[in-house]
């Protein structure tokens, strides 16, 4: 698998490419399948349809890897928090975890209640071409904890930050419990057939440097070490969004560092490129214009070169109204321009 070879810094005929949120609303096929499912959450919990939407971008775009179609919030949901997705508002939990007593709401063994995810993985791996990799994933403990504490997405993270500074022991207790569930979840994804795993720290930038490493990075690092100790052949990818200023302190037992669009690729290469394969980092909005897209591709490839050590990706997820023709062209463009 070209993608796996690249994650292990082995020679590849070109720079492999896949895209975050490559299964999404910009594809009419996805929208049709989602309509058949009934709701976003129903789609996540239906192995047959989750398999279908996972495979769609591989067939349409010819990317080098599929990423499991699911949502990071299925873990806290299976820990006991009732989850709903609301039109125009996004996900929301009906309960929040803000006190020691609230911790009692959380049930252990969430990884054992996610059978629909593992069944989807079995189906995807059976249907996916053997040269195409399948990526499993989870959210970071910090990112999941913010949803569990706030009850929904937030711009200020007021409750989470209040807990961090006024009751750090409680926050650590939440993070530890989430981390244990995530370790089991990734292990079961690997046993079900994924070829690599990725941890998304979507809200990393909410924290200042002095607390980021204690309350987020250390937990991600621990999860990565857990996976590498048990499955050394499985590449582990970490994606902490928006921490360009912290790159000097990044270390741990993982393989691939995801670079978001706001982090200069040359900076990431200078700070991390000798230790980790870098993944990224095209600004997704460039896909609105073919010329701007090509300009971005040329810039990234000029920095990363044609040697191993790079997986091409967007620096954030695909936007719902991006022209699919440009996504198809992006894959061809990267393959052609990075050919060894």
Swiss-Prot record:
Main location (coarse class): cytoplasm
Site positions (Transition state stabilizer): 71
Compartment list: Cytoplasm
Catalytic reactions of this protein: uroporphyrinogen III + 4 H(+) = coproporphyrinogen III + 4 CO2
Cellular component terms (Gene Ontology): cytosol
E.C. code: 4.1.1.37
Binding, substrate: 21-25, 40, 71, 147, 202, 316
Superkingdom as given in the UniProt entry: Bacteria
GO biological process, alphabetically ordered: protoporphyrinogen IX biosynthetic process from glutamate
Keywords: Cytoplasm, Decarboxylase, Lyase, Porphyrin biosynthesis
Top-tier EC class: lyase
Gene3D superfamilies: 3.20.20.210
Molecular function (Gene Ontology), one example: uroporphyrinogen decarboxylase activity
Pfam families documented for this protein: URO-D (PF01208)
Subunit structure: Homodimer.
Function: Catalyzes the decarboxylation of four acetate groups of uroporphyrinogen-III to yield coproporphyrinogen-III.
Family (UniProt): Belongs to the uroporphyrinogen decarboxylase family.
HAMAP family, A to Z: URO_D (MF_00218)
Protein known as: Uroporphyrinogen decarboxylase
Organism name: Wolinella succinogenes (strain ATCC 29543 / DSM 1740 / CCUG 13145 / JCM 31913 / LMG 7466 / NCTC 11488 / FDC 602W)
């Amino acid at each position: 698998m070209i993608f796996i070879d690249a994650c292990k810094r082995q020679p590849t005929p070109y720079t492999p490419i896949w895209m975050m949120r490559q299964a999404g609303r910009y594809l009419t096929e996805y929208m049709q399948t989602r309509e058949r499912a009934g709701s976003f959450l129903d789609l996540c919990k239906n192995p047959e349809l989750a398999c279908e939407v996972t495979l769609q971008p591989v067939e349409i775009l010819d990317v080098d890897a599929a990423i499991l179609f699911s949502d990071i919030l299925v873990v806290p949901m299976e820990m006991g928090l009732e989850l709903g997705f609301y039109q125009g508002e996004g996900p929301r939990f009906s309960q929040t975890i803000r006190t020691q007593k609230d911790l009692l709401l959380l049930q252990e063994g969430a990884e054992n209640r996610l059978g629909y995810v593992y069944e989807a993985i079995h189906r995807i791996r059976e249907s996916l071409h053997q040269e195409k990799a399948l990526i499993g994933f989870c959210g970071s403990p910090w990112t999941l904890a913010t949803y569990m504490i706030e009850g929904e997405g937030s711009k200020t993270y007021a409750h989470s930050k209040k807990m961090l500074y006024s009751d750090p022991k409680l926050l650590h207790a939440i993070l530890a419990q989430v981390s244990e569930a995530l370790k089991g979840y990734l292990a079961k994804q690997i046993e079900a057939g994924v070829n690599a795993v990725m941890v998304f720290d979507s809200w990393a930038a909410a924290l200042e440097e002095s607390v980021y490493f204690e309350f987020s990075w250390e937990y991600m690092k621990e999860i990565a070490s857990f996976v590498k100790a048990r499955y050394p052949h499985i590449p582990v990818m970490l994606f902490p969004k928006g921490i360009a200023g912290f790159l000097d302190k990044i270390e741990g037992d993982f393989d691939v560092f995801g670079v978001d669009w706001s982090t200069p690729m040359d900076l990431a290469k200078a700070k991390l490129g000798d230790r980790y394969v870098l993944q990224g980092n095209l600004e997704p909005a460039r896909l609105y214009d073919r010329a701007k897209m090509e300009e971005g591709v040329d810039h990234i490839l000029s920095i990363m070169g044609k040697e191993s050590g790079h997986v091409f990706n967007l620096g954030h997820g695909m936007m719902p109204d991006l022209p699919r023709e440009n996504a198809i062209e992006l894959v061809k463009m990267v393959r052609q321009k990075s050919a060894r």
